[in-house]
Amino acid sequence: DRLTIHLSKFYHIHTILGTENSNELLREIGEYLYDLCGKFHVFHTAGDAFTVFADTKEQCERLKCEIQKRFESDWVVQENRIALDMETVVQHYPTDFKAIAEYYGMREFLLENAGKSGAQVIVEADADMTAQYRRRRKVEIAVARAIREKGFLVYYQPVYSLKEKQIV
């Protein structure tokens, strides 16, 4: 199981605090996650994201609750108290993804959905979201292949209204 913690609007904090202080904040978050989860379970996967590997669903649930609880309080860097908003995405292997590329694509899809929900949100992948992502991915692949092979044809199918007796 994978937990991805995305720090919402971290670029604002980086702009306000500067590179040195924002790096210190990331270091503190990384150390907290390392202490909580252990070696080889925490990865800084992007400038504003961490990924935590959990061995079991129970461990994943426990970590999710503890991380959410910690992010409800402020982080302190150079006497600055910083409230961080985060979006957490939970994905289960092999039900939600089977390959690393699918994991990353699904993660981005879920983070996009989490961003629409507000701050301190946890989105857990389910069968519906997984199917939605896979449908979207099939369309993206089909469109990319059609463009690459110059075989992209668009058909206009007019709709005739029987009530109005005209094309609408």
Model-based region annotation:
Residues 1, 7-34, 43-47, 57-65, ...:
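Conserved long alpha-helical elements within nucleotide-processing catalytic cores of c-di-GMP signaling
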Residues 39-41, 155-156:
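A short linear hydrophobic-aromatic micro-motif
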Residues 40-46, 71-88:
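Catalytic core regions of nucleotide second-messenger enzymes
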Residues 49-69, 77, 96-102:
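Short helix/loop segment flanking the catalytic signature motif in cyclic-nucleotide metabolism enzymes
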Residues 73, 89-91, 157-159:
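Output-coupling edge of small sensory domains
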Residues 79, 103-126, 142-153:
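Catalytic/regulatory signature loops of cyclic-dinucleotide turnover enzymes
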Residues 85, 94, 113-138, 155:
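Flexible, glycine/charge-rich interdomain/linker segments that couple
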Residues 131-168:
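Active-site core of bacterial EAL-family cyclic-dinucleotide phosphodiesterase domains
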